[in-house]
Amino acid sequence: MHEWALADAIVRTALDYAQKENASKILAIKVVLGELQDVNAEVVEFAMKELLRGTIGEGAEIIFEEEEAVFRCRNCGHEWKLKEVKDKLDERIREDIHFIPEVVHAFISCPNCGSHDFEVVKGRGVYIAGIKIEKEEGE
């Protein structure tokens, strides 16, 4: 259900943008999916296509790009990637992080110094990286 809510927000944003730009058609929507949130791209794509049906976005190409999750320790400055520690997380913890990415601090620590005080440098959320539109001739 979380993916449907994300898809709805993406579609509403794309349609609002297209309307403000007086677009006649949305040709493509590029969406970046942060690795940390572990969003199911297939479900988001299906939901987006359903939500775009009957709008100027129907038939738009949907492009996904996964953004690797990178962390930086505030204590020692060490940087590491989620894939380096992901195998230590069980399915329940991954589900918790999926819904509330901020809880990652409770389950992951810096592999260098053990601190839980780190920042997510990239790969946390979901955002629209681009919307390609078509305008009527003369606009």
UniProtKB/Swiss-Prot annotation:
<feature type="binding site">
    <location>
        <position position="113"/>
    </location>
    <ligand>
        <name>Zn(2+)</name>
    </ligand>
</feature>
<keyword id="KW-0862">Zinc</keyword>
<dbReference type="GO" id="GO:0016151">
    <property type="term" value="F:nickel cation binding"/>
</dbReference>
<dbReference type="InterPro" id="IPR020538">
    <property type="entry name" value="Hydgase_Ni_incorp_HypA/HybF_CS"/>
</dbReference>
<dbReference type="Pfam" id="PF01155">
    <property type="entry name" value="HypA"/>
</dbReference>
<keyword id="KW-0533">Nickel</keyword>
<feature type="binding site">
    <location>
        <position position="73"/>
    </location>
    <ligand>
        <name>Zn(2+)</name>
    </ligand>
</feature>
<dbReference type="GO" id="GO:0008270">
    <property type="term" value="F:zinc ion binding"/>
</dbReference>
<feature type="binding site">
    <location>
        <position position="2"/>
    </location>
    <ligand>
        <name>Ni(2+)</name>
    </ligand>
</feature>
<comment type="similarity">
    <text>Belongs to the HypA/HybF family.</text>
</comment>
<protein>
    <recommendedName>
        <fullName>Hydrogenase maturation factor HypA</fullName>
    </recommendedName>
</protein>
<keyword id="KW-0479">Metal-binding</keyword>
<feature type="binding site">
    <location>
        <position position="110"/>
    </location>
    <ligand>
        <name>Zn(2+)</name>
    </ligand>
</feature>
<comment type="function">
    <text>Involved in the maturation of [NiFe] hydrogenases. Required for nickel insertion into the metal center of the hydrogenase.</text>
</comment>
<dbReference type="GO" id="GO:0051604">
    <property type="term" value="P:protein maturation"/>
</dbReference>
<dbReference type="InterPro" id="IPR000688">
    <property type="entry name" value="HypA/HybF"/>
</dbReference>
<dbReference type="GO" id="GO:0036211">
    <property type="term" value="P:protein modification process"/>
</dbReference>
<feature type="binding site">
    <location>
        <position position="76"/>
    </location>
    <ligand>
        <name>Zn(2+)</name>
    </ligand>
</feature>
